[in-house]
From Swiss-Prot:
Keywords: Cytoplasm, Cytoskeleton, Microtubule, Phosphoprotein. Regulator of the tubulin polyglutamylase complex (TPGC) that controls cytoskeletal organization, nuclear shape, and cilium disassembly by balancing microtubule and actin assembly. Regulates the assembly and stability of the TPGC and thereby modulates polyglutamylation of the microtubule, which antagonizes MAP4 binding. Residues 1-225 are annotated as: Required for interaction with TPGS1, LRRC49, and TTLL1. The keyword Cytoplasm applies. It comes from the Eukaryota. One of its GO terms (cellular component) is centriolar satellite. This is Centriolar satellite-associated tubulin polyglutamylase complex regulator 1. The keyword Transferase does not apply. Interacts with PCM1. Interacts with TTLL1, TPGS1, TPGS2 and LRRC49; the interactions link CSTPP1 to the complex TPGC. Binds to alpha-tubulin. It is found in: Cytoplasm, Cytoskeleton, Microtubule organizing center, Centrosome, Centriolar satellite; Cytoplasm, Cytoskeleton. InterPro entries: CSTPP1.
Amino acid sequence: MLSPERLALPDYEYLAQRHVLTYVEDAVCQLLENKEDISQYGIARFFTEYFNSVCQGTHILFREFSFIQATPHNRASFLRAFWRCFRTVGKNGDLLTMREYHCLLQLLCPDFPLELTQKAARIVLMDDAMDCLMSFSDFLFAFQIQFYYSEFLESVAAIYQDLLSGKNPNTVIVPTSSSGQHRHRPSTGEAGTPEGVEASLFYQCLENLCDRHKYSCPPPALVKEVLSNVQRLTFYGFLVALSKHHGINQALGALPDKGDLMHDPAMDEELERLVLRWRPHRSSRQHRAKEPGAFGYQRRDKLEALQTVPPASAPTPCLYQWEPIE
């Protein structure tokens, strides 16, 4: 049911706020690319399943990075998908390197940029080498901040650098590739020089930044809470504080609390159901393998499986968007 606040918005403002046109344009593109396959199910059914997938957050699976980062909902959906797909890494206590986490990200988004993974790893590793091992939870919460608020953090990095160099903090900051976050590394202050910048002045600049820009920013009240606990801080100290802040994680709404990170009852139930379906099939195949002529049966099964594989020349459809749901 629509809330009164949504109904009070003008139609054009609601469309812009929810990025509806972005999804309509993407749906039409998918329709045109796969029109021959979709024609047998109907256009109405395709649009129904497409927007159902948007609501469920599965529409971002295996899509290009430009689409994954196109809207806040897409970013939150990607974070949730990454957590649900690979939480067993944390459940098993495995530690991975930055490169290994990047490979996991590329399983969901083949062209996911390495630079973004490196920035997330730097929040965790600080002064350590980039090939050091990280826990799943540490990387995930750092990645959440870096990925969801990437444009905000680029501007914050430029502001921090200007404050360090003594420039006017009220100057409008336009982040560029040369003023980006990758230039800033944790370092110890020189002898007699306080490290970092003054927290109160830093907050004033960030408050103005959130007012000026339309992209996603952490709630200003929570940013103020983070900065009110210290007198001075470094840029990466600020990012670490954001990644560990319980309220910011709740406000973003993509991931559970750290204590519940390894629990996903819905996914566990689905996996258990799939395992139960697979076991009888495996037992049947093992039993048949002991019977005379089992090789012929196995070969026939393989041929039947190969017949279901589409030819290499066929267009690759987005199955989650148009395949009929039984």
